[in-house]
Regions:
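Accessory RNA-recognition modules of RNA-modification enzymes
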Residues: 1-169
Length: 169
């Protein structure tokens, strides 16, 4: 069987974001299956620790945005050397909002992207967003933060290595 670490393995995630006044502001986490609820997460042990450790910081920053109630989701893509987050927003950010997001991106060393509509509207928050890529079986794969990639890189690497082994003459 192919196995991976139990914790910190998840390299791709889509978190729901919702402003709930009765809960004191923004909640963030995975959507409950077949329900309109979000499981409010302050940490997520299956996510890469670089992201899990900053969920409350993200929440705090989002709570201070003028459009906090208009952010429905956060798409996360993680590689060995980069973390990219696509912030889906339904209303435009103010200049103050953009400054706050830039400060967080610099402090966390993350790349933020903004998405106001479909995939064709995704733009980097700043002009210096680094490309995402990972190496597998000697091939470097480049991708965008919203592209499909395997959630569990360790399992993916093991499966590819096993497939190559089985296909060898």
């Amino acid at each position: 069987p192919v196995r991976s670490p139990q914790w910190g393995y998840r390299r791709k995630a889509r978190l729901g974001v919702k402003y709930v006044d009765k809960k004191g502001g923004v909640i963030m986490g995975f959507r409950e299956r077949a329900k309109p609820y979000i499981t409010d997460c302050h940490q997520c042990d299956v996510l890469d620790e670089r992201v899990s450790a900053l969920l409350d910081t993200l929440r705090g920053t989002f709570n201070q945005l003028s459009v906090a109630a208009r952010i429905p989701q956060l798409e996360i893509a993680i590689t060995d050397n980069r973390v990219a987050m696509v912030i889906r927003h339904l209303d435009s950010f103010s200049d103050s909002d953009l400054d706050g997001l830039q400060r967080l991106a610099q402090a966390a060393e993350f790349d933020f992207y903004l998405q106001s509509g479909g995939l064709d509207t995704v733009v980097p928050l700043t002009g210096n967003a680094q490309p995402l890529n990972y190496d597998i079986a000697g091939v470097t794969l480049k991708f965008e933060p919203f592209d499909f990639t395997q959630v569990n890189q360790v399992v993916n690497e093991k499966m590819v290595a096993r497939a190559i082994e089985l296909l060898a003459p």
